[in-house]
Amino acid sequence: MIKVNIKRNNGLIESIKCHGHAGYDDYGKDIVCASFSTMIITTINAILEIDKDAISYTDTNNLEIINIKKDNITNSLLNNLVNMIYELRNNYDKNINIKEENHE
């Protein structure tokens, strides 16, 4: 199962952490993992194309995206990513788990 942890502060995304494997199919054939990876990579690349200092990310066994600048464009792209993850989870709820923390 892919596990996603989203941290917000006053509605702004501070970080997104992801780990695990969807387990929908064998490695290399898993459409859930392929979709999830595509969404993550596309979002990271779009943000870095606009401003290479807007986020930091690590991609080992656990992916973590940290929103450094928290500007409108970066936050909009990260919110779009979260919305896409929820949409994917709605179709594959046995393969994706999402937790959100919001600090005011």
What are these regions (language model features)?
Residues M1-V32, T38-I41, N45-E104:
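N-terminal intrinsically disordered, cationic/polar leader segments
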